[in-house]
Every structure is written in C-alpha cells, then in structure tokens.
C-alpha cells in the first residue's frame, strides 16, 4: 500500500473521530511543486533537488501534518513526474501525515471523468476531512468547481456542508484547496485564476454561515492574502516555480485554541525549531 493511500485510511477514520484536547500545534502547507514545469516537461531534476531540501526541513520540524495544495506535477499524464513526486513523499517521516489535493495540472485542466479517475488511482482520494485538537480541517477538489463538473461538484458541496455542520463545536474550521475563491475582490469577473462567480458566491456564503476562519490555497505561484468578512484566504507561493517576488518556501501555520497564526518562510530562512 502506498504512503498516500495509507493516509487515505487515516482521513476516512478521522472524519468521525473527535479530540477533546485543544493544545496548540503547527502544520506545514506547501503548494505547486509542479514536477516538470521548470524544464517544460523535459526533466524534473530541479524540482527533485528542491523537494529533497523541503523534506529535510519537514522531517526536522516534525509538524502535526503537511498539506500540499495541488499541482503536484506539470503534466497529469506523465507517469514519471507522478512517480517522482510520490517517491519524494515517501521520504517524509512516517509519523507525519501528508495530505494532497488536486490542482488543474493534476487533472489536465478540464477535470474530465478520465483525468479524475486516473488521479484517484494514483492518490486514492481528492478531498479530505479530519479533526485534530478540536479543529476541523477540510480539503476540497477545487478544479471540479472551476471546470463546472456539475454532478461531482454538487456531491462535494453536500459533503462539505455536512462536515461543516458536524464541526460546529470545534474551535476552528480550516479549508484547503488549489484554487482560491477569488484573487483580489469577491465580486471580480471570472478568470483563469479564480472560481467562477456563480459558484464562488455559494461557497463564500457557506464559509460565512459556518464561520470558517481560514482557507489556504495555491495556484497563483505567489503569496497573497485576501478576506471576505471574517473568512481569510491565504495564497501560498509555489515551492518550485515562483512567479512573484517571494523566494520559494513553505507556510508554517500555528493553531491555538483562540487564533490561527501563519508565516511564510523562504527555503533558506526556515527556523530550525518552532516555538508555540
């Protein structure tokens, strides 16, 4: 059984498991390793070197878990890219759960039935929900929302609301996805980088209704922070191919009973230990 499928079992189990304690902890988010992008699918050697350094950092910091918010590979049909990404994940300590979510490149842009089926064969799941220390963490397949895969998206929406309803006694509800709901403004027009406005409004209203505090996303390949009322969207830079001014790096998120605190660190600026 592969490393990622092992954690699928954990994810399913944790949907129904609750935790009484509220001790602070931290997790790591990284996004868009996109194996193959740097050399236009001719090689992924540069991504491998970067991700091996990231693994060393993760193993040293020993976070509660790691979330990779999509675009694991540049070409979702390139088995070599997929295999290398999965190999890198196996280098992370076995006691650190690793959760992944699909990006548009993983599903070949259109999120067809075939691409979703292939993704599920490789990773075992395309969304997740678990509780840890009285906080609820939910990961969505955002490419199917973007691509308007109506039937699949509706099923996911029902699943999402059910899990939000079941988490009302939690201190926090935190969402993960590849696409941010919007890039600059909640009412901005549809574009490649955001969720279409018709669907966007549904999800933003749901975030408000169930008091979701944070979303951590990727896709843009640069860092940004946006808000919709009390709902905060944090977009994290690509770990391998930044398109903005920030260095490649990771986001460390500290979860306290009464607040969420997060910082982005360039790969050469990450502290050797984290103080809570």
Language model: regions and residue ranges:
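Acidic, His/Gly-rich catalytic cores of divalent-metal-dependent hydrolytic chemistry
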Residues: 257-276
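Bacterial Sec-dependent N-terminal signal peptides
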Residues: 1-22
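Surface-exposed cleft-lining segments at the edges of enzyme active sites
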Residues: 37-41, 72-76, 143-151, 186-191
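Hydrophobic beta-strand anchors of alpha/beta hydrolase catalytic cores
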Residues: 27, 66, 137, 173-174
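Extended active-site neighborhood of metal-dependent phosphoesterases/phosphodiesterases
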Residues: 79-172, 193, 197-214, 225-263
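Active-site glycine-centered loops adjacent to acidic/histidine catalytic or metal-binding residues
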Residues: 32, 70-71, 103-104, 140, ...
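N-terminal active-site segment of His-dependent metallophosphoesterases
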Residues: 17-82
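Short acidic, glycine-rich surface-loop motifs adjacent to enzyme active sites
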Residues: 167-185
